Amino acid sequence: MAIAIIAEYNPFHNGHIYQLEYTKKNFPNDKIYIILSGNFTQRGEISLADFKTKSKIALKYGADFIIKLPFEYATQAAHIFAKGAIKIVNQHKIDKIIFGSESNDVENLYKLANLWNQNQEAYNAFLKYALKLGYSFPKASAFALEEISGQKIVFPNDILGFEYIKQIVANNYPIRAYTLKRSEEFSLKNPEPNIASATYLRQLVNENKSISRFSPMKFIHPVCSLPNLYPEFQKIVRETSAENLAKIWLISEGIENLFKKHINEPNFEKFLNAVNSRRYTNSRIKRAMVYILFRIEDPSQFDEEKIQLDCWKNQGF
């Protein structure tokens, strides 16, 4: 018997420690597997710590086994991220997963996943309609689900958890999902006394502020971040033709021309704001930037271990 947690640990923090302790307490007979993304994340971020460091800290705080989520899944949209993660869970004959959920209503997520599975033709028609209107893929997916179910999934952990359960249902995997209540106030503006979101902690780290109240991890500047690589990204986009940029994975729908149009923006934030639109979310743009930076044409053949950034060398716990 085993249970999986699908994680990025960017960075590992007290909320993750609580999740591991909760899982050990409530599933005492199960080995805990962490399906862990590597040096890059689903939102197109460069991980503050590398895979080896994240693995060590997870094992220290209660995980039994670490399985790497391949780059080709770890740096994709939520539905592809979930597809890869749940496929690995099934391949290792792990019969349970547990994830944080704002609603903590796993039965409703199963209900919606079954409804989606039984009405895929209608769902896909609504999805295509919304995409033609210029919606981003996440917003188009939310629109299609609401059209067939009358429900919106609002919170980010519920959205990702729903994608996990969709994969379980669609593939008839012998896996049962469980949820751990996650507060909606677990955010930038309202960190709890010793627990805060990874987004908030990344902000603190990037501002060279201590996160010791919230995490056992320690970071030394300069830290790994996409903004720090923006000058290199500018150089590549300026020197590469639009035709050759379009050969890179995730560079489609003319986004290469949009990048070239705004490549003279003076910094990462201004570039992101210039390119962001109803169709292109920040995460979609950042994932594309990562693929351009490392010239990745086929993510299934990309060995991220060959990328050794100096900013990973002194990060630890």
Swiss-Prot record:
Tagged with keyword DNA-binding: no
InterPro entries xref list: Rossmann-like_a/b/a_fold, tRNA(Met)_cyd_acetate_ligase
Root EC class: ligase
Subcellular compartments: Cytoplasm
Binding-site list for ATP: 6-19, 100, 157, 182
EC assignment: 6.3.4.-
GO biological process assignments: tRNA modification
Leader sequence segment: none
Catalyses which reaction(s): cytidine(34) in elongator tRNA(Met) + acetate + ATP = N(4)-acetylcytidine(34) in elongator tRNA(Met) + AMP + diphosphate
Entry keyword set: ATP-binding, Cytoplasm, Ligase, Nucleotide-binding, RNA-binding, tRNA processing, tRNA-binding
Gene3D superfamilies per record: HUPs (3.40.50.620)
Functional note: Catalyzes the formation of N(4)-acetylcytidine (ac(4)C) at the wobble position of elongator tRNA(Met), using acetate and ATP as substrates. First activates an acetate ion to form acetyladenylate (Ac-AMP) and then transfers the acetyl group to tRNA to form ac(4)C34.
HAMAP family the record matches: TmcAL
Protein name per UniProt: tRNA(Met) cytidine acetate ligase
Organism: Mesomycoplasma hyopneumoniae (strain 7448)
Gene: tmcAL
